Amino acid sequence: MCGIVGYVGNKQVVPLIIDCLRKLEYRGYDSAGIAVVNESHDLEIRRAEGKLRNLEEVIRLSPLDGTYGIGHTRWATHGRPTEENAHPHRDCTGRIVVVHNGIIENYLQLKEQLRKTDHQFVTETDTEIIAHLIEEYLKEHHNFEKAVRRAMLDLKGIFALAIINADEPDMIIAVRQGPPVVIGLGDREFFVASDIPPILQHTRDVFFLGDGEMAIINRDAVRVTDFEANSVQPTIQRITWDPIMAEKGGFKHFMLKEIYEQPRSVRDTMQSRISLDTGRVFLDAMKNITEADFKRFTSIKIAACGTSWHAGLAGKYMIEQLARIQVDVDYASEFRYRDPVMDENTLLLVISQSGETADTIAALREAKELGAKALAICNVQGSMIVREADGTILTHAGPEIGVASTKAFTAQMVALYLLGLYPVSYTHLTLPTIYSV
């Protein structure tokens, strides 16, 4: 899982990008790199195998400067973990550079096509062909934005991209088809990242790109379109997390810190959702799911991956015991391939900490096509799953940086209890029952 960052603004870009990359280290990586355009419109790249400190040493020995650029932490998929294969990658002219999270499935076919028009490749990666493909379409369209958009239509696979062209000053184009891309909004400055924590100390105002969308970012504005050039209005949200929650705060590592944050995540997830006077449970983000729907549901199916799937397994017992509704649990990657039986009397419950888990999103879409309602338990407001679900129980656990889930899992368990209590809270739920739970 690679990490991408980008910045356009008035600050010195190198220390800012290095700091953002450091906050993406939890995703895992084997190399790192940065590309910056300086005031003379020269594009400079520094890359290093291994840890981020190796890249910092390369930059110390060979400094670079500028006010916009992109950075990357790579986890090798195509090509060995070497400096040569580290991102960013450039085209033949050396003026277009790309960082990429994902996999291009048809890169070998595209590579052969590009070789026929004299493109020269210097790495073993699938990413490099993207820069060359944009270069090729730039010759045809003479417009960077159009060239990027046309190139995207040729790619098969999943990809999150940040792209710069040294001949287009103060511009970054960010693209999403699968992996998450977050755009941060500042005062005449904009940020691109794979996740919220890297940019949290710089801005609280963000939006997520949707699949098949691209953001054209310059120093003054950001504009979003789809791959067909249709304008898209992004949904901007304000992140309420305290930036300190994305720091270790004196703990030896994030996992230990997040273990100690579990009581807070439980409290914040329950906050204002249970009336101790009446015993009523309130789920406040049910966009298209009513009390009448809950009374109609005859079964619940849970689809999730990883830790969220384990939460779902435990949640099955909670919901069946409390709400007396039959519950089945599926691993999200298998859900849509087993031809599930669902209709308007079925509720699909999808669980995802990030709200961007690809297989869980696919399960949600499958269920909605079959006429079922979809409810999400999620930790990230504005994420893809939250946007597409008919209702959401936000867990309010704050950013979870540790790879082994702790507080996010605990908050999911609380949300599952709330869901189990909800259908009966407006009929026969008593305060002793709440206290016993």
Feature-to-residue mapping (PLM):
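Single conserved hydrophobic/aromatic residue that forms the stacking wall/gate
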Residues: 428-437
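Conserved short alpha-helical segments that host acidic/polar catalytic motifs at enzyme active sites
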Residues: 1-253, 261-298, 337
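An acidic-aromatic substrate-binding cleft motif
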Residues: 258
